[in-house]
């Protein structure tokens, strides 16, 4: 037996070479000349891809025996193949007509193109038009990993074919757990769509879904069509089922419509529109439920976000949301998304500009406040409008200079027809200059600034004594100089930690702040509150946060000390210990309305620690201790153990001391323990869960009494990992929706690799609730046209 190899090039390859050369010449002629100045890299025309027409692509033939005329008809016998740059055809015997491109394959037909392999006992194909037919074909689709068997296949083009009496599966297992049987299946690879007519979805050989018209993707890309239905149940809405339809409108925008049925409330329609372009992006979502069965009212919500670059440093953006009523998110939360705690919906629009040294914007910022009848809230002030300007120049002859100015008109919405405070205008400007001195092992940063504020207030001739305000002056101003000095050092030494070589650091830091007293009792309070004392706040210029309607007088020194143990080989931080305290040289005289001034000469102690004692165990501790009454003001302790994949245990304890009665500028107390777990139970079974339990036993308010003690959130679930292409999940969730009410939800999901998921996806819930959660299905790499090569 002899091996012959004939190469058919003739005029086709010559024409291709002439065309390629011509393209190179024209490309070179049209290339722009390099501009004077910095050199510019240009792509060589010789590196460009030049495609020939299908009928001019040369073909290579190989077989044990070849006979015939290469200019007309050739017969290949024994290990025969016809190979082109865009595909290959193999068989026991191949008859090839060069003039028409027709190929007749007999025995062990095998065709490979773009990673998709088709086999069968015989086939007829035209290599120029890539059309033909195959008897009893088997398919391996490279881009998606899917497989199919059919009685007959008609191939219409490179991208379109029709299969008759088909069994299709996207499961890569030797014995697929799921498959679709259909009378016919039309595949369109350009449109990324498979259409099965009279199709039935089987799982474990049991039919679970039938449809006269079923679509599915043939590549791991977006396509229009119905998504898998989601379903579950909640105590507030009953049985919940939705059937989303996805519109792949264009590469840069799409639309999803979500018809949804809630057994206790009725039918709802939701939608999400996403778009992305050169210099802009955005999303718009909304839902509408007419005539809620429970309330008798129409229920709806919407949210739209957009950001766009306008050129020359200008930009605009908005974030606008709204809901039909206060209880919308408590009654109709999305499955798996605990939106019941949503309190404020933003309504903001902004236009801005930025350059190297300056930034500015003008915006209107309003809110819709969703009230909880068991714990009503005072609505925040609207900013209608706000103008903001910042200039900054760093390392300017060694100096850092900043200038920040704002001008705001504040209006507060009424609460049940009652006015809760004055309205007015506020102008602020704050220029600062600092001179950072940074050297190896130490730093020193002196800083000075002057904060000026001008108010024009509408008091509405009301008596505001109840909030500490009784001065009705229309205009008022305040000028406060602020001076600070920040200094620190870093020492290092060789050490050991648990018998392992380490580098230990010692990092002392001192921060001195001087702010003279200015009487501010006659100024309104719009957007200012007392900041939580923390390691970050200990080095700030003001104990108040927000818009600085109050600037506290200060003559104080903050001392802090941090030590770290770093792995000597990798630099990984194994252990960190920190402590800080303020020392006051004068009493506090500036306060918020109803705030009790500080009289102590020392602040609470701040202590913190983080430790990665092993590669699988991490702990964090942060606490605030009051040395005067020997009580903890705030604390948090957490630990996480992850000995292996799909195995994690996280525990946390959080404590916040209750504020004194009548104090509204401090957060409500908290005393809560949390436990979150992901753990393998037996072979393919995995358990997941979380519980948050409030330990509060002496609530300060009636609203807090509703919460004490109780489970604020509970999650329990099971995951079963079948073979390589399916996972089953069932998850139960119970969570608080208000100070007195709770909601429960139950999720069922069957995830079929290569097809999608039936039921409601709880993965986002588990990712948020269980630190270190991992999916039992590892991500699979995206297939390419190079999955197979012969």
UniProtKB/Swiss-Prot annotation:
Transmembrane segments: none annotated. Keywords: Cell outer membrane, Membrane, Signal. It is found in: Cell outer membrane. InterPro entries: LipoPS_assembly_LptD, LptD, LptD_2, LptD_C. GO terms for cellular component: cell outer membrane; transporter complex. It comes from the Bacteria. Residues 1-20 form the signal peptide. GO terms for biological process: Gram-negative-bacterium-type cell outer membrane assembly; lipopolysaccharide transport. Pfam families: LptD, LptD_2. Together with LptE, is involved in the assembly of lipopolysaccharide (LPS) at the surface of the outer membrane. Belongs to the LptD family. Component of the lipopolysaccharide transport and assembly complex. Interacts with LptE and LptA. This is LPS-assembly protein LptD. The lineage of its organism: Bacteria, Pseudomonadati, Pseudomonadota, Betaproteobacteria, Burkholderiales. The gene is lptD.
């Amino acid at each position: 037996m002899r091996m012959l190899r004939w190469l058919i090039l003739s005029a086709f390859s010559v024409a291709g070479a002439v065309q390629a050369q011509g393209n190179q010449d024209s490309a070179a002629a049209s290339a722009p000349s390099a501009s004077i100045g910095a050199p510019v890299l240009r792509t060589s025309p010789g590196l460009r891809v030049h495609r020939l027409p299908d009928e001019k692509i040369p073909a290579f033939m190989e077989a044990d025996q070849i006979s015939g005329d290469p200019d007309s008809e050739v017969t290949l016998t024994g290990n025969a193949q016809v190979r082109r740059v865009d595909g290959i055809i193999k068989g026991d015997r191949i008859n090839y007509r060069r003039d028409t491109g027709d190929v007749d394959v007999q025995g062990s037909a095998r065709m490979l193109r773009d990673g998709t392999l088709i086999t069968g006992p015989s086939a007829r194909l035209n290599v120029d038009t890539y059309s033909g037919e195959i008897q009893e074909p088997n398919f391996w689709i490279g881009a998606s990993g899917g497989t199919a068997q059919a009685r007959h296949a008609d191939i219409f083009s490179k991208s379109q074919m029709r299969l008759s009496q088909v069994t299709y599966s996207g499961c890569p297992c030797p014995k697929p757990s799921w498959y679709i049987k259909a009378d016919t299946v039309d595949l369109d690879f350009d449109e990324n769509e498979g259409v099965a007519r009279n199709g039935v979805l089987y799982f474990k050989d049991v039919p679970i879904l039938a449809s006269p018209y079923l679509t599915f993707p043939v590549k791991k890309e977006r396509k229009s069509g119905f998504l898998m239905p989601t379903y579950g149940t909640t105590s507030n809405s009953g049985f919940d089922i939705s059937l989303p339809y996805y519109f792949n409108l264009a590469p840069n925008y799409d639309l999803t419509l979500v018809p949804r049925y809630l057994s206790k409330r009725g039918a709802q329609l939701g939608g999400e529109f996403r778009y992305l372009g050169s210099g802009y992006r955005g999303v718009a979502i909304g839902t509408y439920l007419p005539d809620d069965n429970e309330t008798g009212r129409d229920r709806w919500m919407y949210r739209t976000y957009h950001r766009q670059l306008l050129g020359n440093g200008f930009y605009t953006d908005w974030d606008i949301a709204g809901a039909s009523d206060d209880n919308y998110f408590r009654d109709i939360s999305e499955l798996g998304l605990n939106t019941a705690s949503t309190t404020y919906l933003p309504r903001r629009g902004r236009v801005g500009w930025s350059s190297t040294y300056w930034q500015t914007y003008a915006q209107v910022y309003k809110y819709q406040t969703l009230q909880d009848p068991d714990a009503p809230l005072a609505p925040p002030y609207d900013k209608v409008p706000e103008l903001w300007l910042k200039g900054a120049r760093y390392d300017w002859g060694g100096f850092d200079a900043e200038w920040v100015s704002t001008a705001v008109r504040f209006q507060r919405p009424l609460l049940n027809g009652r006015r809760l405070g004055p309205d007015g205008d506020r102008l602020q400007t704050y220029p600062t200059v600092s001179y950072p001195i940074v050297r190896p092992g130490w730093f020193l940063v002196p800083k000075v600034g002057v904060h000026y504020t001008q108010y024009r207030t509408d008091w509405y001739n009301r008596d505001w004594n109840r909030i500490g305000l009784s001065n009705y002056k229309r205009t008022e101003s305040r000028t406060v100089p602020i001076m600070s000095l920040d200094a620190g050092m870093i020492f290092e030494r060789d050490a050991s930690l648990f018998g392992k070589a380490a580098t230990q650091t010692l990092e002392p830091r001192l921060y001195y702040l001087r702010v003279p007293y200015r009487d501010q009792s006659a100024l309104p309070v719009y957007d200012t509150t007392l900041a939580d004392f923390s390691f970050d706040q200990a080095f700030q210029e003001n104990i108040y946060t927000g818009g600085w309607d109050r600037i506290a007088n200060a003559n104080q020194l903050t001392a802090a000390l941090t030590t770290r143990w770093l792995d000597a080989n990798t630099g990984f931080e194994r252990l960190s210990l920190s402590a800080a305290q303020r020392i006051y040289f004068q009493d506090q005289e500036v306060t918020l309305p109803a705030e009790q001034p500080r009289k102590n000469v020392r602040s609470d102690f701040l202590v913190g620690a983080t430790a990665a004692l092993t590669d699988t165990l991490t702990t964090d501790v942060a606490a605030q201790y009051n040395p005067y009454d020997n009580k903890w003001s705030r604390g948090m302790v957490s630990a996480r153990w992850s000995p292996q994949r799909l195995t994690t245990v996280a525990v946390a304890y959080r404590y916040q001391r209750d504020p004194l009665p009548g104090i509204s500028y401090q957060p409500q107390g908290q005393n809560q323990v949390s436990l979150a777990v992901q753990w393998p139970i037996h072979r393919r079974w995995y358990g997941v869960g979380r519980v948050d339990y409030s330990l509060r036993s002496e609530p300060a308010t009636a609203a807090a009494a509703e919460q004490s003690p109780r489970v604020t959130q509970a999650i329990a679930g099971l995951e079963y990992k079948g073979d390589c292409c399916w996972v089953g999940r069932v998850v139960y969730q119970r969570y608080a929706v208000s100070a007195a009410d709770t909601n429960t939800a139950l999720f069922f999901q069957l995830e079929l690799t290569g097809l999608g998921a039936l039921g409601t996806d709880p993965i986002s819930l588990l990712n948020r609730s269980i630190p270190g959660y991992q999916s039992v299905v590892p991500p699979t790499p995206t297939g390419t046209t190079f999955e197979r090569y012969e």
